[in-house]
């Protein structure tokens, strides 16, 4: 709920530039996250979808071929101002796109905040074309914490496979890096 407030959206980039390094125990910084995102998704050719785009950080890696969706009008306003491009108000569990519309989907840290993480994984799979790829980064558990989805790597792998992905989950400190392909 707090993430929908304008002050949180305005200050989010300050947290985002530091959080990857802090939560990964220094194993990955934001620049490294964006490099991995590019390396994993760009070879698919685009277009790309960023689910839970927030302030549009992934646009720095994916460029104009990216569409960002977020349920927060405040975040989308900041995204459009800081990283102009195509953004839509939408939830990751109910994406407003046709089946197979994208070659790559990125889901960053907001994955932990989905009310239905399994539904979000199924939706990501639905909008990916055959051979499409998913990139994800999220806080690992074990278990939910303060209402956040925080799976173990094994539970996350089962969730992704259940949604139709062949996936790899790498633990980086408290973060899980997801590299998945349509199965």
Language-model features, listed with the residues they occupy:
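Conserved class I S-adenosyl-L-methionine
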Residues: 1-43, 57-58, 75, 142-144
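Class I SAM-dependent methyltransferase SAM/SAH-binding core
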Residues: 49-94
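A short acidic, Gly/Pro-enriched loop at the edge of an enzyme's catalytic core
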Residues: 93-105
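A short SAM/SAH-binding and catalytic strip from SAM-dependent methyltransferases
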Residues: 104-116
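A short glycine-rich, Lys/Arg-flanked "PGG" loop and its adjoining helix->strand segment in the class I
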Residues: 118-130
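Conserved beta-strand signature within the Rossmann-like core of class I S-adenosyl-L-methionine
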Residues: 132-139
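Short alpha-helix
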Residues: 148-163
């Amino acid at each position: 709920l707090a993430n929908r407030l304008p002050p949180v959206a305005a200050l989010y980039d300050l947290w985002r530039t530091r959080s990857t390094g802090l939560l990964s125990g220094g194993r990955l910084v934001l620049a490294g996250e964006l490099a991995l995102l590019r390396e994993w998704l760009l070879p698919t050719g685009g277009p790309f979808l960023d689910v839970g785009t927030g302030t549009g950080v992934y646009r720095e890696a994916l460029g104009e071929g990216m569409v960002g969706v977020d349920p927060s009008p405040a975040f989308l306003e900041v995204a459009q101002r800081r990283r102009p491009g195509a953004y839509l108000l939408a939830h990751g569990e109910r994406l407003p796109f046709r089946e197979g519309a994208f070659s790559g989907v990125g889901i960053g840290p907001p994955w932990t905040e989905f009310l239905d993480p399994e539904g979000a994984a199924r939706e990501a799979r639905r909008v990916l074309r055959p051979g499409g790829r998913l990139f994800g980064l999220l806080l690992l558990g074990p278990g939910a914490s303060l209402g956040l989805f925080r799976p173990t790597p094994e539970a996350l792998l089962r969730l992704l496979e259940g949604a139709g992905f062949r996936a790899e989950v790498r633990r980086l400190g408290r973060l899980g890096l997801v590299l998945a392909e349509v199965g």
